């Protein structure tokens, strides 16, 4: 358990389909599809993936100008792409923002997640398609996050990190009671996504204020990801230099 991390370092469709990353069999057809899929990142995508953020849950009315206004607060932007439908031209609700400097990227990653833009609370993460080994997109049954209503939640990302597996010690005097409690906890863990706030607060706060009171999910792990990000970036730069 010492090597356990709430954020996946490598994408595994089977683990992503499990709230604690311990499933041994796929629980839905989408996971099967992702396990069988072979995905190659789009080589036509330009820009440095290690300086690019993924911004999602945008209002369909939010324009490029608004995103540039908000995200330029953290540093100079090199490239901004709001993804649109090729036929209708309407926004698909997500964008990619490339910064000129790593410092700006990290600041935006820490501070922009959860901001409200045009009445929508946005989600911010690093680009994963070109940086997370083994990545499988949502359309092939993979991805991360998702809505509970869809029945296809994917764990191991910033939005829905893995929950630490439950390993409760067995009490010799009360073996049956302990076993029932463990089963109850495991059953509950399948039905809800983990929230770091104390449970009693959930009853005291309205859903409309969730974005204001939300605690950062595993903030200490964000710092770990930043260190890993810098190490990976250095390795990538070295490979590029050697290939020249």
Curated annotation (Swiss-Prot):
Q: Please give the Gene Ontology molecular function terms for this protein.
A: mRNA binding; snRNA binding
Task: Give compartment(s).
Answer: Nucleus
Q: Which UniProt keywords apply?
A: Isopeptide bond, mRNA processing, mRNA splicing, Nucleus, RNA-binding, Spliceosome, Ubl conjugation
- GO terms for cellular component: nucleus; U12-type spliceosomal complex
Cross-link Glycyl lysine isopeptide (Lys-Gly) (interchain with G-Cter in SUMO2) mapped to chain:
172
**Where in this protein does the record put region Disordered?**
146-244
One GO BP:
mRNA splicing, via spliceosome
Q: Which residues form the RRM domain?
A: 51-129
Listed Pfam families: RRM_1
According to the UniProt entry, which residue ranges have a biased composition of type Basic and acidic residues?
A: 146-162, 173-185, 192-244
Q: Which InterPro entries match?
A: Nucleotide-bd_a/b_plait_sf, RBD_domain_sf, RRM_dom, snRNP35_RRM, U1_U11-U12_snRNP_70-35kDa
Annotated PANTHER family = U1 SMALL NUCLEAR RIBONUCLEOPROTEIN 70 KD, U11_U12 SMALL NUCLEAR RIBONUCLEOPROTEIN 35 KDA PROTEIN
Quote the subunit structure annotation: Component of the U11/U12 snRNPs that are part of the U12-type spliceosome.
Annotated protein name in UniProt: U11/U12 small nuclear ribonucleoprotein 35 kDa protein
Native source organism of the sequence: Rattus norvegicus (Rat)
Q: Taxonomic lineage of this organism?
A: Eukaryota, Metazoa, Chordata, Craniata, Vertebrata
Q: Which gene encodes it?
A: Snrnp35
């Amino acid at each position: 358990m010492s090597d356990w991390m709430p954020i996946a370092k490598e994408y595994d469709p089977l683990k992503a389909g499990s709230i604690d990353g311990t499933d041994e069999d796929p629980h839905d057809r989408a996971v099967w599809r992702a396990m069988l899929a072979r995905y190659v990142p789009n080589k036509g995508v330009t820009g440095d993936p290690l300086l690019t953020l993924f911004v999602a849950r945008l209002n369909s009315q939010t324009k490029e100008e608004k995103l540039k206004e908000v995200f330029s607060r953290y540093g100079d932007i090199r490239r901004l792409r709001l993804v649109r439908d090729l036929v209708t031209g309407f926004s698909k609700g997500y964008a990619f923002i490339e910064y000129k400097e790593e410092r700006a990227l990290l600041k935006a990653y820490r501070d922009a997640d959860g901001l409200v833009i045009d009445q929508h609370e946005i989600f911010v993460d690093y680009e994963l398609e070109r940086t997370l080994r083994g990545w499988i997109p949502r359309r092939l049954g993979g991805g991360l996050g998702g809505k509970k209503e869809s029945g296809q939640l994917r764990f191991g990302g910033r939005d829905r990190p893995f929950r630490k597996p439950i390993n409760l010690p067995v009490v010799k005097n009360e073996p049956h009671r302990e076993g029932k409690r463990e089963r109850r906890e495991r059953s509950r863990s399948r039905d809800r996504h983990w929230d770091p706030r104390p449970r009693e607060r959930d009853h005291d706060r309205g859903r409309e204020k969730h974005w204001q009171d939300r605690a950062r999910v595993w903030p200490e792990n964000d710092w770990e990801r930043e260190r890993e990000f810098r190490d990976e970036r250095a390795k990538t730069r070295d490979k590029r230099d050697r290939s020249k």
